[in-house]
């Protein structure tokens, strides 16, 4: 079967489950907010800033994360946070994304006086506006940071639970893995789960399969962010497959951080062929310089995914999202009808 075209993949209804708010700003917006908030940007215009922010020289995950200090400098006010969330949803909708879970750490947005509550409510307003205007459903995942104290993670878990009925659908842990084990934050995960909040966890990106094991067995994560090195542990891979634990795959980001040597050698193809529940995501649209359609194209061109396989990956995203069951079922039914129409067009 011939490879699907970019336009077909753009029109394919997609779910984005792993997208960082502070890694997905428009460079044009960064320039404008920098002037407005008197924050110095490392480049004078949007195109130069885009090139600067796109990571192509990282030695590892920690190198990749350094640029987030720049985006966070203009994410310290309510209007900025609302605008950035709105624009991310707008851009995603134009890329064929029907549902997006936007994740970020509100504790990083309170350096200039915002409360944690304000740092949650502003992006939620932006996502709600975008939903009304563009038809894209947007929800929030509150993220804790591995190298911060477990007490901070606990505070963020409590914050996420407080907004569980108001647009926050999950709790997450991110940041450099090496030397910052997920098990140190187990109490925060336990609090979130015991208050009926879904959990995901970055693992197996900057560290080995044991990091995934901690995320699954100690923290009780329902999904795993990246899981690039899960493949190193056959037993754990089988466990994740048997339990249908979703793997949030981010191809370009993994190549940038050296978690994978290339697109062609990424384990995504093997995960799919073994039946694992895999979902494609952008991770950071700005730092990785990608859209979700780009990631689907990489899977087609470098890993020989055909339309039917990528349609299955797209459905995995909707089936694995953290929406309530009834909302999820309605969304899946709509998506399946669109996929059938596209399938006839692609054949």
Locate each region found by the language model.
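Metal-cofactor-binding active-site regions of metalloenzymes
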Residues: 1-197, 206-211, 218, 222-223, ...
């Amino acid at each position: 079967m011939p490879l699907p075209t970019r336009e077909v993949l753009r029109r394919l209804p997609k779910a984005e489950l792993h997208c960082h708010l502070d890694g997905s700003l428009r460079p044009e917006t960064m320039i404008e907010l920098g002037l407005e908030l008197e924050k110095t940007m490392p480049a004078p215009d949007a195109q130069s800033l885009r090139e600067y922010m796109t990571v192509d020289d990282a030695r590892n995950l920690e190198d990749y994360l350094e640029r987030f200090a720049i985006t966070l400098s203009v994410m310290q006010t309510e209007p900025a946070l609302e605008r950035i969330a709105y624009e991310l949803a707008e851009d995603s909708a134009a890329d064929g994304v029907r549902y997006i879970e936007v994740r970020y750490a509100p504790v990083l947005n309170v350096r200039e006086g915002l409360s944690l509550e304000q740092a949650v409510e502003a992006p939620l307003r932006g996502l709600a506006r975008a939903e009304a205007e563009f038809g894209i459903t947007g929800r929030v995942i509150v993220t804790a940071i591995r190298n911060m104290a477990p007490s901070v993670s606990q505070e963020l878990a409590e914050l996420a639970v407080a907004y569980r009925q108001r647009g926050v659908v999950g709790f997450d842990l991110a940041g450099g893995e090496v030397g910052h084990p997920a098990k140190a934050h187990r109490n925060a995960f336990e609090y979130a789960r015991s208050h009926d909040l879904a959990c995901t966890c970055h693992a197996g990106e900057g560290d080995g399969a044991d990091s995934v094991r901690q995320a699954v067995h100690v923290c009780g994560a329902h999904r795993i962010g990246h899981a690039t090195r899960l493949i190193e542990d056959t037993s754990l891979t089988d466990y994740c497959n048997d339990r249908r634990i979703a793997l949030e795959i981010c191809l370009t980001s993994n190549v940038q951080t050296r978690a994978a040597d290339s697109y062609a050698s990424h384990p995504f193809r093997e995960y799919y062929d073994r039946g694992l529940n895999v979902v494609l995501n952008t991770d950071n649209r700005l730092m990785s310089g990608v859209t979700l359609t780009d990631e689907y194209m990489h899977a087609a061109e470098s890993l020989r995914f055909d339309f039917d396989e990528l349609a299955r990956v797209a459905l995995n995203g909707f089936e694995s999202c953290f929406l309530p069951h009834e909302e999820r079922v309605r969304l899946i039914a709509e998506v399946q009808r669109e996929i059938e129409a596209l399938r006839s067009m692609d054949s």
